[in-house]
């Protein structure tokens, strides 16, 4: 990364090779997945000792979860320097599976509560453990949503500490660019999405941010990784946004949006607590059900035309659709339904004919139908209703009438659909 490394390798023996040539005190070092273990932490400490580095000066985020790895993290607490973060509560991964922003904040808050509760039950000072955690929050393409999410997360943390009688403690907040927002179609647009996502994190006050190459879904190339790193540094440093503690403070729009999101996030947290806490909410399927329901609502908005995606439903580019790597199969991407539609259409493209009538509505309906068909990568032939010979020669599978409700008398054409009925269907993808 630009200023930090995130390690995922399960083999502790590979750690020395991975960090060869790396000045440990100069960067942040994080662990996740199979690498987030006490063994990896001890291996890193031994490596730092061999190099003569002061362990207390290292910026370490071990990334232990607040549920199943809680005991392991609490056991490390006594020996680890105070600056080392042992726990991480990850809302980003659940965001990618479909959770709304409020549900994600509620889940993170529930994870933080579980950590503090577990520390108190183990006889430790929960206030000391409060400084041992970081959170991972999703940054969507909507910059304002990212700003509000970061600011609301800090409000929820402050509220949780206050409710627990713990003195205010800074929360290390990591903003991660959403993977849910990405598309295989016109993948270069993902660079724009990542830029606006990280802008939201920078204005919202994220302590660290991570972006991804625009081609991540099909395998990041070096150029994509470099661009993502440059965007991160631009937003965190060169933009100057980090010079202010809270660049968005005082904006009525941002303040209200933050307040509304914090209120909704606290309600989501209370719902999880009422279900028995985060562990029970996950085991019962409550969190997964929330993600599926939110994804379904998101899909419905896309179908109805209430939301759009650049390069997917707006300004789509014709061409084949690549396949995403298997590791991203669990991500609930709104663009996926359009990608599937494009693959289906390209596998067996129908012969489409747009028949233009003489009514005043014909031109507008034609433009709307061309935009709609472009979502599926379909290119229709366009003829006037009076071009009988050309219509017969086209041998269309489907005739779409613009400014007309039926095929002109005497013309033999394929299945006829009136453009008006298609455009008014309420499901622009289903009609395709």
Model-derived features: where do they sit?
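Intrinsic disorder at enzyme termini
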Residues: 264-351
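Short glycine/threonine-rich loop-to-helix capping motif typified by GTGT followed
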Residues: 100-105, 140-152, 178-192, 219-228, ...
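Flexible, glycine/charged-enriched surface loops at secondary-structure junctions
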Residues: 121-132, 161-172, 238-249, 272-285, ...
């Amino acid at each position: 990364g630009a200023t930090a490394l995130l390690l995922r390798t399960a083999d502790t023996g590979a750690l020395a090779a991975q960090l060869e040539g790396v000045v440990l005190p100069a960067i942040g070092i994080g662990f996740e997945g199979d690498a987030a273990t006490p063994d990896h932490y001890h291996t890193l400490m031994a490596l730092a000792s061999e190099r003569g580095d002061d362990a207390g000066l290292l910026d370490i985020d071990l990334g232990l979860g607040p549920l199943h790895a809680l005991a392991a993290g609490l056991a490390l607490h006594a020996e680890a320097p105070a600056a080392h973060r042992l726990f991480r509560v990850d809302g980003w991964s659940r965001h990618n599976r479909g959770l709304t922003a409020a549900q994600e904040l509620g889940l993170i808050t529930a994870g933080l509560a579980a950590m503090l509760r577990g520390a108190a039950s183990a006889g430790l000072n929960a206030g000391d453990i409060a400084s041992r955690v970081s959170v991972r929050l999703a940054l969507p393409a909507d910059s304002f949503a990212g700003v509000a999410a970061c600011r609301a997360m800090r409000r929820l943390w402050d509220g949780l500490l206050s409710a627990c009688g713990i003195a205010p403690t800074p929360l290390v907040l990591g903003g991660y660019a959403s993977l849910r927002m990405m598309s295989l179609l016109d993948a270069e647009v993902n660079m724009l999405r990542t830029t606006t996502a990280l802008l939201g994190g920078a204005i919202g006050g994220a302590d660290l941010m991570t972006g991804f190459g625009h081609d991540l879904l099909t395998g990041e190339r070096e150029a994509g990784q470099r661009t993502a790193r440059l965007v991160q540094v631009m937003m965190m440093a060169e933009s100057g946004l980090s010079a202010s503690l809270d660049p968005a403070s005082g904006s009525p729009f941002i303040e209200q949006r933050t307040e509304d999101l914090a209120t909704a996030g606290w309600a989501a947290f209370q719902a999880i607590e009422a279900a028995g806490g985060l562990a029970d909410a996950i085991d019962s399927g409550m969190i997964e059900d929330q993600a599926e329901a939110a994804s379904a609502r998101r899909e419905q908005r896309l179908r109805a035309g209430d939301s759009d995606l650049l390069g997917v439903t707006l300004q789509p580019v014709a061409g084949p659709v690549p396949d995403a790597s298997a590791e991203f199969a669990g991500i609930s991407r709104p663009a996926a339904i359009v990608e599937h539609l494009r693959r289906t259409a390209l596998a067996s493209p129908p012969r489409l004919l747009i028949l233009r009538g003489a009514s005043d509505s014909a031109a507008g309906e034609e433009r709307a139908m061309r935009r709609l068909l472009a979502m599926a990568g379909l290119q229709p032939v366009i003829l006037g209703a009076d071009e009988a010979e050309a219509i017969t020669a086209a041998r269309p599978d489907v005739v779409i009438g613009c400014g007309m409700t039926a095929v002109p008398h005497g013309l033999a054409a394929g299945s006829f659909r009136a453009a008006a009925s298609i455009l008014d269907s309420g499901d622009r993808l289903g009609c395709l």
